[in-house]
Structure formats: structure tokens, C-alpha cells
Amino acid sequence: MNNPDLPYRQALECLSQKQYNFTEVRRLLTEAFSAGHPAAAFELAKHLMDADSPYQDREQGMEMLRIAAEQGHPYARYNLAYIQELEGAPPETLIPLYRPLAEEGLPEAQVRLMYLLYASRHFEEALEWAKTSAKNNNPHGQYLLAQYCRYGTPPDFETAHLLYRKSAAQGLPEAHWQLGLQYRFGQGTKVDTAQAVNHLRAAAQQGYIPAYTPLAELILPTAPDEAVHWFQQAAQENDPDAHAALADIYLQGKHLERNHKLALHHAEAAAAERHPEGLRILGDICRYGLGIAPDTEKARHYYRQAAEAGSLSAYQKLISDSALNHPDQYGGIKDSAIRRQRAERLYQKAQALHYGLQCAPEYAAALKLYTEAAELGHSKAQTNLGSMYYFGQGMTADYNEARKWFEKAAAKKDSMAFYNLACIHYSGHGVEPDKEKACRYLQEAINNGYGQKSVLQELLQQWQNAV
């Protein structure tokens, strides 16, 4: 049999020319892979599956990819697995495909395996692959290892910060985003607004959606035009914080010309996600008839919803309204407002101690304060308290106690609580695994304003495929 390397090298020589005869290239590569050349079928598959190529033939390209994989070509095997992942194959199908490639040292397979293990809550094995990947200076491995340091028991915010910096230096947008948040809130480093802006802008300019709104919030006083641009970009992705910010901007006529119609549009969009300030602004629009007919009953309805969602300013509106128009309700509303204000103060202190915001983390103190706020009905405190029990932060993990607090928060439509319940029921932590119930909870998280809807929608599709 002829040496298969000869036609393969001839094909590569043809491809190196600005203009080449693809029919001849195809003949040479076919001759090479038929004689057993391990890279020839993969090279032909690349050109047949190139969407920009005039010779694209996906069906033939897939056939070549399969032949290359059968001949042991690592990237052919990787691409077949990745195509299955894009088509929605569940993690339990994909993990056995990526694992041998990762063990052979393929960096891309190590990253995919690492993320799939993490998403499937196989945290210990995911951590080992993150360490391996980070050791090889892979930005994804550095990022996930930073996440483990940040959320570990105990947390190591300084190491997380250093790993985020290494990952961001290689351009990973999510690492820039996390650095921006750390500099903004003083976690693992001193507060540095200029650095926060630099990193959030680097992430946003790469199209990383979660960075849009925090960047806009920081630069609004000094660069209002750019801030409005990022708020608008985030609003196009249905970020309720961005919608609420734009509603206020259009209503006040600050940084943009006053526009009651657009204020109403953005307030309604934020309110649809149960955003407390979006609901409060909608109440103001109805109360004062800003671009619409005044409607005090509707205003009270939105203020009540906003107050239930946590808006202290909405409570103040209800207190003022009841003092003037419903004195019999004044005492009850005032007591509720005082209770909410106390719960919010407890929650803010607990959050700082939990996540080490401008202080060293203290889990025992955070747990005590979260519990007090949770017992006062603060939904975010209930969710964070559940997370502490779930991950065993400051105590032995207790899935039943975690689920109890997640369910209390979910009863108040807290989107993160719905997400956590979805994970509990999918993984069977403290309960029998129930993928259908997990999918229902995940859909509720999407419906109730979870910050990264597209990520959850992709996850929901994977879970539904596994049912």
C-alpha cells in the first residue's frame, strides 16, 4: 500500500495556496484516510463542515468526522461529542465521551468535562479537573478553581482574586466580571471603583451580559451616555434591574429626555419580573397619572406588590397613603414597614459577613443574622440561609433544613430559591430524585426574574431531554 502521508502532505500543500482545486484536495485526502492516515479524514471534515466554505456538505462532513474518530483522531472524537452537546445531549451521555479525551490531555475536553461535572453537581471530580486545567494555565480552569476558592468552606477570597486575575489576563470575560464585582464590593481586595469599571467594561465589551447593568450603575454619574447604552443593552436581554433603571431615568428626565411612555414600558417590563423598584415606579406612574390617567387603586396595588417584594420606598408610599385615606390600616402597614426595615438591616449585615464584603467572612455570625432576618420573612435571607445549610457553611450540611428555607423563599417567588429547589430535586439531595419536579422549579426560576435566563433555558432543555 502507498505511504498515506504523501497524499496528505500534497493536500496540505494545495490548501496552502490562495486558490486551489478542492476536487483535487478531496481526492488526495480521501486517498490518505483510506490508507489509514489519522488526520486526513478530520482535515476533510473541517472543510466540508465550514459554514463559510463554498464546498460545505454537512452530511459528508459528519461522515468524515466519524471516520476520523474511528481512526482515533482526538479532535474528531471531541467534535462529535461537542456536536451532541450543542444538540442537547444530557451530561450523563456526554461525560463518558469527554472523560477519556480529558485523561489523554486534550485541553478542550478537560474544560467541557469540568463544566459538565460541575453542572451535574459532581463537585469533587470537577474540582480535580479544574486544578489540572489551571495547572496548565487554562483560563477556564483558573476561573472554576477561583469559584471553588470563593464559595468554599472556608472561603479563600484572596486566592480566588489572584486566580480571577490570571484568567482575566487571558481575556476570559466572566473572570473580568467577577473581578469587577470584587473590586466594587471589596471582596478579597480593597474597594476600587476605577478597577471595577475597567474589568466590568472589559467583560461587557466582549458581550458578557451579566456585566452590562453593574457597569452602567457605576458609570451613570460620570459617563451617563455610555451608562444608558449599557442599560439599554441589558434591557434588550430583559434584565429587570436595567428596565427599572431606565424607567426611573425616563421618568425623571435625567440623562435622557423625559418620556413617560418609555418609562411605563420599562416599569412594566421590570414589574413583570417582580422587581421591587419596577413595581414601585409603576405605582408612581399610576398614582400621579404620568402619561396615563391617574388610578389610585392601581397605584396601591403596585405599591403593595413592591412592598411585598422588598421595596422600603413602597412601604413609605403606603404609610403616607393610609395616613391620609385609610387610617384604620395605618398601624398595620407601619408595623410591617418597621419589620421589613429591620429584616433588611439584618440581611445586609449577614450578607457582608457571609461573602466577606469589606471584612473577613464570619459564617457563625452570618448564620445567626440570616436566621433572624429569615424569621421576619425576608425572602433573600431565607434563600441565603438555605444555601448555608446546603453547602455546610459554618455547620454540617443539612439538605432538609436547606430545602425548608428554600421552600419558604419560593413561596414568596424568589427566583434563586426556585433554582436551588430545582437542583435539589434533580440531584436527589435529601429527597428522591425527581427530574420532572426539578424542571418545574427551573421553569419557575425563569418565570420569576432569574438574572441569567438564557443559561437556565439551556439547562432546562438539557434536563427535559433527560426526563
Swiss-Prot record:
Gene3D superfamilies: Tetratricopeptide repeat domain (1.25.40.10). InterPro entries: Sel1-like, Sel1_AlgK, TPR-like_helical_dom_sf. Sel1-like repeats lie at residues 38-73, 107-138, 139-172, 173-208, 240-275, 276-311, 343-378, 379-414, 415-450. Keywords: Repeat. Present in outer membrane vesicle formulations which are used as vaccines in human. This is Uncharacterized protein NMB1327. It comes from Neisseria meningitidis serogroup B (strain ATCC BAA-335 / MC58).
